[in-house]
Amino acid sequence: MNLYDVIRRPLVTEKGVMKKDTERTLCFEVSADANKTQVKSAVEKLFKVKVDEVRTATFEGKLRRRGRFSGYRSDWKKAYVKLKAGEKVPDFAEI
């Protein structure tokens, strides 16, 4: 799997920014097929940092309706990546 297939986009949310500032933890939307070792290696290669720990959470797609037609959004996965002590936390606004 390609590095850019593993990491889809950074999640810039209120909780994610708070974790980035206090706990050196980054938040990403990742591929549903990616595992923790793939996420770790992708972050280390893309941002040139050392990763301490990866935690993942899987979310089911929500029901969405448009008029009389209904369907589901795709399932997705979120990854919290904690950096080792002494590593510079990348700012997504600079990238």
Curated annotation (Swiss-Prot):
One of its GO terms (biological process) is translation. Keywords: Ribonucleoprotein, Ribosomal protein, RNA-binding, rRNA-binding. The keyword Lipid metabolism does not apply. InterPro entries: Nucleotide-bd_a/b_plait_sf, Ribosomal_uL23-like, Ribosomal_uL23/eL15/eS24_sf, Ribosomal_uL23_CS. It comes from the Bacteria. One of its GO terms (cellular component) is ribosome. GO terms for molecular function: rRNA binding; structural constituent of ribosome. SUPFAM superfamilies: Ribosomal proteins S24e, L23 and L15e (SSF54189). Part of the 50S ribosomal subunit. Contacts protein L29, and trigger factor when it is bound to the ribosome. HAMAP family: Ribosomal_uL23_B. One of the early assembly proteins it binds 23S rRNA. One of the proteins that surrounds the polypeptide exit tunnel on the outside of the ribosome. Forms the main docking site for trigger factor binding to the ribosome. Belongs to the universal ribosomal protein uL23 family. This is Large ribosomal subunit protein uL23. The gene is rplW.
